[in-house]
């Protein structure tokens, strides 16, 4: 069973006749074969949703997604070593944390 997460719904055939009619201030489920294929939102509803998501993201710590392969880590290490070897004493003296 598929959940429909909107109070209003429209099938794709009806949506094609007049799409602008369904961009209202609440979500509209778009159905295909009586199953939700997607949802329509007005610009203001979408902006409000994005604002809520941004607020939530600010409250949560960021999860790292940097998971390089062993070969990629070796390449990063090799390049870092090369950069360090190429640095001059002046480069090291200019470093500030």
UniProtKB/Swiss-Prot annotation:
Keyword line: DNA damage, DNA repair, DNA-binding, Repressor, SOS response, Toxin-antitoxin system, Transcription, Transcription regulation
Keyword DNA-binding: yes
Gene Ontology cellular component annotations, sorted alphabetically: toxin-antitoxin complex
InterPro entries the UniProt entry points to: phD/YefM_antitoxin, YefM-like_sf
Molecular function, one GO term: sequence-specific DNA binding
Annotated SUPFAM superfamilies: YefM-like
GO biological process: DNA damage response; DNA repair; regulation of DNA-templated transcription; regulation of growth; SOS response
Signals that turn on the gene: Induced by amino acid starvation, glucose starvation, the DNA cross-linker mitomycin C (SOS response) and when translation is blocked. Induction is decreased in the absence of the Lon protease suggesting, by homology to other toxin-antitoxin systems, that Lon may degrade the YafN antitoxin. Transcription is negatively regulated by the cognate locus, probably by this protein. A member of the dinB-yafNOP operon; it has 2 promoters, 1 upstream of dinB and 1 specific for yafN-yfaO.
Family affiliation: Belongs to the phD/YefM antitoxin family.
Subunit field text: Probably forms a complex with the mRNA interferase YafO which inhibits the mRNA interferase activity.
Known function: Antitoxin component of a type II toxin-antitoxin (TA) system. Functions as an mRNA interferase antitoxin; overexpression prevents YafO-mediated cessation of cell growth and inhibition of cell proliferation.
Name assigned to this protein: Antitoxin YafN
Phylogenetic lineage: Bacteria, Pseudomonadati, Pseudomonadota, Gammaproteobacteria, Enterobacterales
